[in-house]
């Protein structure tokens, strides 16, 4: 695409689920000849540099994350701390403002993309720059945050769905986000998000109109500003990176579509009793399984936390792994037939693109809304039943998995049929290209000051 070439400064929240989609979008912009300066914590450089497909156009600059009382010394990213300490890390991000201003002065960008650093529009105005609030969670999550304080399970006036809602039994997911510290650390998450939405020049959302168009329209109307869509922005398949040999060998020992793969994201740490119940539920399915989760709270290793006799009983059929795994490559392995997921937004798109049956066990508020979108609105997945405390039993997990894995299951056939339809829509060759082209045109207009009705 021709036209004006621009320079973007990106400053995402210090979490893998935010930095990687920012970088995926940076690759799309760089591919079209635009320049990106990408700010991130030093610890994240090594983790992300292999995703940079255009190192001549995308330049990483690291920021020093200052220490904040209440965080372990050296903390830089969200994956290093419990969710309840997120507000402290956000406070540390606020203390990088001087560094960000110095970078803006040095590289002279045309636009600044940000998400949780709510003060970026103030910085940009001082330099005469435009800002884009880039939303990498679902549009439904943002729509629900715009009308806080209502009754759980009751859609507020004008809200576009009676299904994609937090219900009374989901209150536990909000408790998990409540800060455990008593220090005043500035705005909370809701205040940061709403301030960012209201003060940015434009809102951009990593979604597709086909999936969340009604929520995007709602946000545009509520915020009274243009909402641009980037599409899902999937990374290009990396032909140079293959699935680790240990997983190729292990998965290849099973029949096609027979393995249940469970992963709950980089931030979820289960209580020990819930972790054990998860393991027992996987055992109960009777299917081969691979579980990739962090050691539960209070345990330093997976092995010490496993239920008594579990390893011996599932030997040769099940494996619980406490380290990082190549989730997209595992999902694309022919032996994997079911994905049990927390339904973080990145995992939501990966599950939609996969051939696997989808079972969802959300842990936090936005994951619950993503789950409602997939299970209740699109009907492509099954949600694990829970008690009001948030507890899920081994039986409810097993029932959910078997309801989609058994070939004679009416529910399984329904979600498989719907999943196939939506996967074909999302993966259609022209969809992604069309979104990115239109998005770049809108950015060119924003930089040049051109307006289109």
Curated annotation (Swiss-Prot):
UDP-alpha-D-glucose binds at residues 266, 325-327, 342-350, 364-367. GO terms for biological process: anthocyanin-containing compound metabolic process. It comes from the Eukaryota. It is an enzyme of class 2 (transferase). Its EC number is 2.4.1.-. Keywords: Glycosyltransferase, Transferase. PROSITE patterns: UDPGT. CDD domains: GT1_Gtf-like (cd03784). One of its GO terms (molecular function) is UDP-glucosyltransferase activity. InterPro entries: UDP-glycosyltransf_plant (IPR050481), UDP_glucos_trans (IPR002213), UDP_glycos_trans_CS (IPR035595). Belongs to the UDP-glycosyltransferase family. PANTHER family: ANTHOCYANIDIN 3-O-GLUCOSIDE 2'''-O-XYLOSYLTRANSFERASE-RELATED (PTHR48049:SF176), GLYCOSYLTRANSFERASE (PTHR48049). This is UDP-glycosyltransferase 79B3. It comes from Arabidopsis thaliana. The gene is UGT79B3.
């Amino acid at each position: 695409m021709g036209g004006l070439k621009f320079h973007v400064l990106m400053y995402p929240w210090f979490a893998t689920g935010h930095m990687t989609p920012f970088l995926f979008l940076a690759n799309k912009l760089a591919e079209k000849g635009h320049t990106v300066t990408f700010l991130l914590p030093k610890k994240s450089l090594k983790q992300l540099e292999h995703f940079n497909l255009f190192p001549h156009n995308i330049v990483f600059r690291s920021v020093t994350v200052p220490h904040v009382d209440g965080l372990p010394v050296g903390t830089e990213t969200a994956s290093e701390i419990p969710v309840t300490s997120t507000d402290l890390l956000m406070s540390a991000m606020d203390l990088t403002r001087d560094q960000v201003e110095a970078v803006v002065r040095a590289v002279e960008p045309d636009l600044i993309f940000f998400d949780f650093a709510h003060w970026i529009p103030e910085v940009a105005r001082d330099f005469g720059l435009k800002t884009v609030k880039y939303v990498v969670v679902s549009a439904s999550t943002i729509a629900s945050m715009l009308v806080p304080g209502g009754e759980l399970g009751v859609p507020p006036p004008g809200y576009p769905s009676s299904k994609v809602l937090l219900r009374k039994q989901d209150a536990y997911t909000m408790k998990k986000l409540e800060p455990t510290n008593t220090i005043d650390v500035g705005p909370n998450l809701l205040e940061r998000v709403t301030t960012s939405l209201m003060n940015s020049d434009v809102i951009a959302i990593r979604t597709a109109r086909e999936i969340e168009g009604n929520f995007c329209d709602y946000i545009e109307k509520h915020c009274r500003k243009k909402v641009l869509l980037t599409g899902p922005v999937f990374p290009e398949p990396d032909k140079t990176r293959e699935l680790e040999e240990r997983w190729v060998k292990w998965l290849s020992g099973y029949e096609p579509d027979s393995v249940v793969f469970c992963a709950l994201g980089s931030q979820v740490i289960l209580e020990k009793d819930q972790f054990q119940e998860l393991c027992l539920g996987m055992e109960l399915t009777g299917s081969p399984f691979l579980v990739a989760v962090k050691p539960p709270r209070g345990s330093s290793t997976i092995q010490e936390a496993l239920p008594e006799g579990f390893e011996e009983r599932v030997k040769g059929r099940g494996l619980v792994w406490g380290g990082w795994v190549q989730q997209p490559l595992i999902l694309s392995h022919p032996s994997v037939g079911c994905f049990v997921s927390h339904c973080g937004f990145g995992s939501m798109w990966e599950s939609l693109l996969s051939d696997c049956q989808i079972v969802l066990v959300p842990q936090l508020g936005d994951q619950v809304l993503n789950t409602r979108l997939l299970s209740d609105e699109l009907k492509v997945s099954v949600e694990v039943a829970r008690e009001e405390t948030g507890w899920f039993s081994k039986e409810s997990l097993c029932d959910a998995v078997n309801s989609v894995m058994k070939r004679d299951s009416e529910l399984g056939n329904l979600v498989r049929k719907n999943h196939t339809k939506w996967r074909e829509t999302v993966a259609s060759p022209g969809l992604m290209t069309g979104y990115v082209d239109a998005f770049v045109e809108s950015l060119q207009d924003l930089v040049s000051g051109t307006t289109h009705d």
